[in-house]
Amino acid sequence: MSEAKVGIFVDYESPLARRVAGDVWSGLSRAALEAGFTKTTAHWESLREVRTPTEGPSVHVFAIGQDRPDAIDAVGAVGDPGAPHLYGVIVAVPGKPSPLAGSLLYQGVERLTGTGVKAGMVEPALLHAVPAECERYARRLLERLGSS
C-alpha cells in the first residue's frame, strides 16, 4: 500500500462539525500509518461551497453538525455516483444529542443513495467530539476501504 487519499467536506459554520472532522482526520492519519500506507493526504473543502471533484480520493467524508442541520442539503455524490468510492456521513453531536440527530443522519445517507451511490458504500455515524470515538470510526473507514 502506498497512499491513502481522503476528501473531507466540512460544514465550517458548525463548531461541532469542525471539531469532529479534525478528530476523524487525526484518527485516519494514525490508522493509515499503522495499516502500512506511506502517505496520507486529505483534500478539505467547505460543504457549503460548490464542490470540485478531485481525482484520486477513494474515501469522501461529509461532516455535518447537529447544530447546523440545514447543511445536510449539501451532501451528494462526488463525481460519478457509480464509481467505487466509499462515503462517510457524520453528524457531529453534543454530549446530549437531539432525538432528531438520527433522522438527520438518515437524510444524509438518502441524499447519497438518491443520486445513485450504493447503500453499501456509505458508512454513517453519529459522533461526539471525542478523539477515541472519532478514531474508532476512522479505523472502520480504513477497514472498509481495504475490503472494498
Sequence positions of predicted segments:
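Intrinsically disordered, low-complexity regulatory regions enriched in serine/threonine/proline
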Residues: 2-27, 39-148
